[in-house]
Amino acid sequence: MGVDVNVIFQIAGVGIVVAFLHTILDQMGKKEYAQWVTLLGFIYILFMVATIVDDLFKKIKAVFLFQG
């Protein structure tokens, strides 16, 4: 389909870092900060996926409307 592999590795990397930070903060007793880190990581990934979907829709629109 042409999805760049770097994007998959970026998402996996952010997930690993968020999981690591969440575990450390949770063990330190900072559960509120751990939840915030998880939420911010999720929002960051959500925006990454939204830009990818936006690019996909632009390509589909260009194909069906014959626009460059």
Curated annotation (Swiss-Prot):
Q: Which taxonomic lineage does the organism of this UniProt entry have?
A: Bacteria, Bacillati, Bacillota, Bacilli, Bacillales
- Provide the gene name from the record: spoIIIAC
**Alphabetically ordered keywords of this record:** Cell membrane, Membrane, Sporulation, Transmembrane, Transmembrane helix
Asked if the Swiss-Prot or TrEMBL record annotates the protein with the keyword 4Fe-4S, the reply is: no
* Membrane topology term: Multi-pass membrane protein
Q: Where in the cell is it found?
A: Cell membrane
Q: Could you name the domain of life of the organism this protein comes from?
A: Bacteria
Q: Which GO terms describe its cellular component?
A: plasma membrane
NCBIfam families the record matches: spore_III_AC
- This chain belongs to the protein called Stage III sporulation protein AC
Any single biological process term in GO: sporulation resulting in formation of a cellular spore
Give the stretches traversing the membrane: 5-25, 33-53
Q: What is its main location?
A: membrane
